[in-house]
Structure formats: structure tokens, C-alpha cells
Curated annotation (Swiss-Prot):
One example of a Gene Ontology biological process annotation: CAAX-box protein maturation
The name this protein goes by in its record: Uncharacterized protein MCAP_0715
Origin species: Mycoplasma capricolum subsp. capricolum (strain California kid / ATCC 27343 / NCTC 10154)
Domain of life: Bacteria
GO molecular function: endopeptidase activity
Record InterPro entries: CAAX_protease, Rce1/LyrA-like_dom
Length: 336
């Protein structure tokens, strides 16, 4: 049986573990206690994690009784999550209107809402123009959706770098002066996250005797690789750009930089960030496939904490992690 003292000691070790002070940390220190964790931290915990999790678990458990399809379940989950996010954002902003955007918390709350609205707007535009009415255009539709997502996330990145104090300068200085420290640490966290994460996930589904298959998020992204023709290669290039370069930076700004600032307690931030990262990747509502994303989010959170709140480390670690996944996905298409 695990003693409570052992758990406390473990979390204290996580809290205190970090790289040595370097010039970038002294010039642009990250404030892990920007807000009050018992107030602002709880707003984030409940609006972005607890309420969405309760909702998606309830929908999955009672799906048969409620007589809802997988598509409708995903839609209900997305709409309810946006509602919880909006309420949380209003409460948080009413308490901290001056720092809401500069701290990055506004981006944390705004990201899922903006992504949905941006995708909806361009989806409606495509339907109005009638570009993808023909069934033969499914492959081009996938490319279009990937392009829309890429543009949306690039806009979030640009906005974040322009609003969050010193973020752009800190990242530039880290890459310029600390590459010898940054790259090995990022690779180490990526490798550990990938292999430990996949091992733990396999153990979980084996012990629980689950036959989950591929997550709907992963399935939706990978299925266009099976299409023949030029569209397959266009999609592949866009997929690599989004997955390895754009998405890791955007998601780390949201799930680490902004969330750690808002929660303002290192240990609680690691827990909340890991769960939130999982929720971000189950928009279809398949909660049983949340585990690998939560585990990955946990290691990226550790990278952020270990680097004293330096976005560059968890971002690069996330990129390397995704690169491993992309290489394996593409290799599986050609190696039988």
C-alpha cells in the first residue's frame, strides 16, 4: 500500500526538480504563482477539466439509454465544453480584466472556442461555394480542413506571441543561447513520453480488457493517407507541417504556458494540464482513448516544470514526440 507521505515526497520531488539557472531564466523568469490557485486555479480546473470530463463520461456510460449516435455524442460534448469554457472565461475575466490576455489565460479559454468558430465559418463557406459537393472531392475536403486548422493555429500562435509578455523574446533567446541544453532535454522527454506512455497505455487496456482500437482523433487524421493519387501526398506534406511544427507550439502555448500561469500551483498545474491535454484530443467524445494523450501531456508538463516554465522545452519535446509518431505512421503505409 502506498503511504501518503510517499506521495507527498514524490510530488515535492517533481515540484523541486529543475535545470540550473541560466541567463534566459534570470532575464525572463516564469511566475508559477501569478494568480491564486484556490480561486483562479479552481475556475480553470472546473470549467476546462472536471465539468467536461463528467459530461463526456456520462454521455459514454448512458449512450444506449439516451439513444444517441457517436456523432451526436461528439457534438453534445463539444457544445457543452464550449459552454463551460465560456462561463469559466467570463468568471475569470471579471476577476482579472487587466491581466486576462497579457498573462495568456485569455488564450487558454479562447483557443477551443476560436478553433470551433473558425472551422465552422470556413466549413459553411465551402458549402456555400459548393466546392466539395461531389463525393470525389472527399480527399480535397480533408486537405481543406487540415489547411483551415493550420491557419487557425498559426493565428493563435501569432496572437500569443504578440500578447503574452516577453514570450517571443524568451523563446528566441533560448534557441539562440541554449541549444546544447535544449535539444538533448527535449529529445529525452519525447522518447520517455513516447515509450513509457505507450507501455502504460498497453498495460491499462490489457488490465481493463478493453478493445479500443485507434482513437477517432487519430483515425480522422490518418485515414486520408489510404487514398490513392496526388491528394495523398499533398495531405501528407500538410499533415507533417501541422503535426510536427504548428500544432505542438500552439498546444504548448495553451496547455502549458497559459494554463500553468492561470492555475498558479506547480503540482496542480501538472495534473490539470495533463487532463486538459487529453480532453483537447477527444473532441469526438471517445473518452476511452484519452489515456495516451493524458500520459503525453503529463510528460510535456514535466518538461515545462523542469525547465522552470520555459515554453521552448515542452514545445520541442512535443514536436519530437509527434515526429516519432508521424514516421511510424508513414512507415506503416509502406512496410507490410
Amino acid at each position: 500500500m502506498i503511504k501518503k507521505s510517499s506521495i507527498k515526497k514524490y510530488f515535492k520531488t517533481i515540484k523541486d526538480s529543475s535545470i540550473k539557472d541560466i541567463s534566459v531564466d534570470q532575464q525572463y523568469p516564469f511566475d508559477f504563482k501569478f494568480y491564486k490557485p484556490k480561486v483562479e486555479g479552481m475556475i480553470i480546473l472546473f470549467s476546462l477539466v472536471i465539468l467536461p470530463l463528467i459530461t463526456v463520461i456520462f454521455l459514454n456510460v448512458f449512450k444506449t439509454q439516451l439513444n444517441i449516435t457517436d456523432e451526436r455524442l461528439g457534438l453534445i460534448f463539444q457544445l457543452s465544453s464550449i459552454l463551460f469554457t465560456l462561463v469559466g472565461a467570463i468568471i475569470f475575466w471579471s476577476r482579472n480584466p487587466m491581466s486576462f490576455w497579457k498573462s495568456g489565460v485569455g488564450i487558454l479559454f479562447g483557443f477551443p472556442i476560436f478553433l470551433q468558430l473558425f472551422g465552422l465559418a470556413f466549413g459553411l463557406l465551402a458549402n456555400l461555394v459548393g466546392v466539395f459537393n461531389n463525393n470525389n472531392n472527399n480527399a480535397w475536403s480533408d486537405i481543406y480542413n487540415l489547411l483551415v486548422q493550420s491557419v487557425a493555429e498559426i493565428l493563435v500562435i501569432i496572437f500569443a506571441f504578440s500578447k503574452i509578455n516577453n514570450l517571443k523574446s524568451k523563446v528566441k533567446k533560448t534557441f539562440k543561447e541554449n541549444k546544447k541544453l535544449l535539444i538533448p532535454i527535449a529529445i529525452a522527454f519525447a522518447i520517455v513520453a513516447f515509450f513509457v506512455g505507450n507501455t502504460l497505455y498497453s498495460l491499462i487496456i490489457t488490465e481493463l480488457k478493453l478493445n479500443l482500437g485507434e482513437s477517432k482523433n487519430q483515425e480522422g487524421l490518418v485515414s486520408p493517407f489510404k487514398v490513392q493519387g496526388i491528394t495523398k501526398y499533398i495531405y501528407m506534406v500538410l499533415f507533417i507541417i501541422l503535426t510536427v511544427f504548428i500544432a505542438p507550439l500552439c498546444e504548448e502555448i495553451v496547455a502549458r504556458q497559459a494554463l500553468f500561469t492561470g492555475v498558479s500551483n506547480k503540482v496542480l498545474s501538472i495534473i490539470v494540464s495533463s487532463l486538459y491535454f487529453g480532453i483537447l484530443h477527444i473532441s469526438s467524445g471517445d473518452v476511452y482513448n484519452i489515456f495516451p494523450y493524458v500520459i503525453g501531456g503529463f510528460f510535456f508538463s514535466l518538461a515545462f516544470s523542469f525547465s522552470k516554465g520555459n515554453l521552448s522545452y515542452c514545445w520541442l519535446s512535443h514536436s519530437f514526440y509527434n515526429l516519432i509518431s508521424v514516421v511510424l505512421i508513414i512507415a506503416s503505409l509502406y512496410i507490410k
